[in-house]
Regions:
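Class I S-adenosyl-L-methionine-dependent methyltransferase catalytic core
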Residues: 1-152
Length: 152
C-alpha cells in the first residue's frame, strides 16, 4: 500500500494506539489507517477498466466485538457478509481492465473460503495457503476479455 504505483483504498481513516500485556510485561501497539482514497469497496470511485491489477483484502471476521483490537485493525463483517463480498468482488472486476488480475486475500479463521466462493459466484484460477496455521488463502482471479458476468 506504500508503493508509489499503488492506490490504497479503505472506508476507514483512523489512528489507534493500545497497550497490552505480553510475556515481558506491557507492550504498545499502533495502527494507522490512512488510505489514498476513502471509499467502500462495494462502490469504488474509479472508472470501468481502470486497473491491470487489483489486490483485495476485505474484512474476514464476523464473531468479534466491535471494539476488539483485531476488529479495529482489520474491520469486521456483519450478517450480510455474503452480499457485501459479492458486491465487492463485482466492483473489483468492474474496475479491472480486460485480462486484468485480481489477487484476493482471505483468512479462513471463521468463514471457509468455499463459503466465500459461493457468495461471490466464482472460484479462483489458483491459490495458495500461508500463515502459521495455513489459514490465510491467496487466490488469483482474472477478468476475461469478454466478461465475468457469472459473478452476478
Amino acid at each position: 500500500k506504500n508503493h508509489p504505483a499503488a492506490i490504497y483504498a479503505d472506508k476507514r481513516v483512523e489512528e489507534m494506539y493500545g497497550v497490552w500485556k505480553s510475556g515481558n510485561g506491557q507492550s504498545e501497539r499502533s495502527c494507522v489507517i490512512a488510505p489514498d482514497v476513502q471509499c467502500d469497496f462495494t462502490d469504488l470511485p474509479f472508472d470501468d477498466n481502470s486497473f491491470a491489477l487489483v489486490v483485495w483484502d476485505p474484512p474476514h471476521l464476523r464473531h468479534i466485538g466491535e471494539n476488539a483490537w483485531l476488529a479495529k485493525k482489520y474491520g469486521r463483517l456483519d450478517n450480510n457478509w455474503p452480499k457485501m463480498l459479492h458486491d465487492g468482488f463485482k466492483e473489483c472486476m468492474r474496475v479491472l481492465k480486460p485480462d486484468g488480475v485480481l489477487i484476493f486475500k482471505w483468512a479462513e479463521t471463521q468463514i471457509p473460503a468455499t463459503e466465500v466462493w459461493k457468495a461471490i459466484g466464482q472460484r479462483p484460477l489458483f491459490g495458495h495457503h500461508s500463515g502459521k496455521k495455513s489459514q490465510t488463502f491467496w487466490g488469483c482471479f482474472m477478468k476475461w476479455k469478454d466478461t465475468n458476468d457469472d459473478a452476478e
